[in-house]
């Protein structure tokens, strides 16, 4: 379980995260929703150690990681797919994937890209020698997720993976995330603006507003709880 307790963060005097507190249960998919600018991306960066926290704590499976460097969090089983994908455009698809294996023992990384990555994302096998920058936005998103999975995480954190992506690939990504949870027991924290995508996938939901968690519950109750109205622009 991922546990976030009383997390606070400031930017240039502005209070961005305000006593953020929630859990992400093991082997389930939790969606974090909220309008633009409420602090969702900042929260994810704090979880991964990209941005330091001012106060509060972060624990993953009982181990406190609040002050741990990013590489230690990856080594503990966390992986992050950032907003905007951030692939390496001049490297091949295969090279991008292998970078994701950097935290694995060298003997494991030398084995190359596991078949299960290509099974989840067949297009990456077909294009493994093409440069990452030549892929479409949807293909790059699949590459970014595949790269994160190369570290063999137990917790996968994604920041708006449907942004700017065609509907057919959105469906593919949704099916893949559901498989990771249902078949592999992976824990997923998904920040998402596309409400219907979140509704379809969520086991649990959390809603952020003005830097704080203002609602939470089971995914099956999102409509009854009025979550659509809470996050409508």
Question: For the regions a protein language model found, what residue spans apply to each?
Answer:
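The feature captures the beta-strand-to-loop junction immediately N-terminal to the Walker
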Residues: 33-35
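ABC ATPase C-loop
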Residues: 148-149
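Helical segment within the ABC ATPase nucleotide-binding domain
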Residues: 171-184
């Amino acid at each position: 379980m991922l546990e976030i307790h009383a997390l606070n963060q400031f930017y240039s005097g502005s209070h961005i995260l305000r006593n953020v507190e929630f859990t992400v249960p093991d082997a389930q998919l939790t969606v974090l929703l909220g309008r633009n600018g409420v602090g969702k991306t900042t929260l994810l960066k704090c979880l991964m150690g990209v941005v330091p926290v001012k106060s509060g704590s972060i624990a993953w499976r009982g181990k406190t990681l609040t002050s741990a460097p990013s590489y230690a969090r990856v080594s503990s089983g966390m992986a992050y797919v950032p907003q905007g994908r951030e692939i390496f455009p001049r490297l091949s698809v295969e090279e991008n994937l292998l970078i994701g294996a950097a935290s694995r023992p060298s003997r494991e990384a030398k084995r190359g890209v596991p078949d299960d990555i290509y099974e989840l994302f067949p297009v990456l096998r077909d294009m493994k020698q093409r440069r990452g920058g030549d892929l479409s936005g949807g293909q790059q998103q699949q590459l970014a997720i595949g790269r994160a999975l190369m570290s063999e995480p137990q917790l996968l954190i994604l920041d708006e993976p449907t942004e700017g992506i065609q509907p057919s690939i959105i469906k593919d990504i949704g099916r893949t995330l559901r498989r990771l949870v249902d078949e592999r027991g992976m824990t997923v924290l998904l920040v998402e603006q596309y409400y219907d995508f979140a509704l379809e996938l969520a086991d649990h939901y959390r809603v952020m507003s003005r830097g704080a968690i203002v609602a939470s519950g089971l995914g099956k109750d999102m409509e009854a709880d009025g979550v659509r109205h809470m996050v409508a622009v």
